[in-house]
Swiss-Prot record:
Family according to the record: Belongs to the bacterial ribosomal protein bS16 family.
UniProt entry keywords in alphabetical sequence: Ribonucleoprotein, Ribosomal protein
Species this chain originates from: Alkaliphilus metalliredigens (strain QYMF)
PANTHER family for this protein: 30S RIBOSOMAL PROTEIN S16, SMALL RIBOSOMAL SUBUNIT PROTEIN BS16M
Record-linked InterPro entries: Ribosomal_bS16, Ribosomal_bS16_CS, Ribosomal_bS16_dom_sf
Entry GO MF terms: structural constituent of ribosome
PROSITE patterns the UniProt entry points to: RIBOSOMAL_S16
Record gene name: rpsP
Domain of life of the native organism: Bacteria
Protein name stated in the entry: Small ribosomal subunit protein bS16
One GO cellular component, as annotated: small ribosomal subunit
Entry keyword rRNA-binding: no
Length: 81
């Protein structure tokens, strides 16, 4: 099973926020996921990012592939270098 760490869109029209989730690569963007590891709110000022570093490192160690956006958020939070 190919596992991705990606963003799940939530919120209202024109006011999105995102949950950072671990999901099967074949599942729909907003569909079934395995575990939630954080959230990202780009609308608030300043932008809110909260990631559970232990869970993220566990999934990265198990071979989960982060998407480009999630990789950027991980770098910003110091989870990956």
């Amino acid at each position: 099973m190919a596992v991705k760490i990606r963003l799940k869109r939530m919120g209202a029209k024109k006011r999105p926020f995102y949950r950072i989730v671990v999901a099967d690569a074949r599942a729909p963007r907003d569909g079934r996921f395995i575990e939630e590891i954080g959230y990202y709110n780009p609308v608030s000022e300043p932008k809110e990012i909260k990631i559970d570093g232990e869970k993220a490192e566990k999934w990265l160690g198990n071979g989960a592939q982060p998407t480009d956006t999630v990789k950027y958020l991980f770098k910003k939070n110091g989870i990956i270098k």
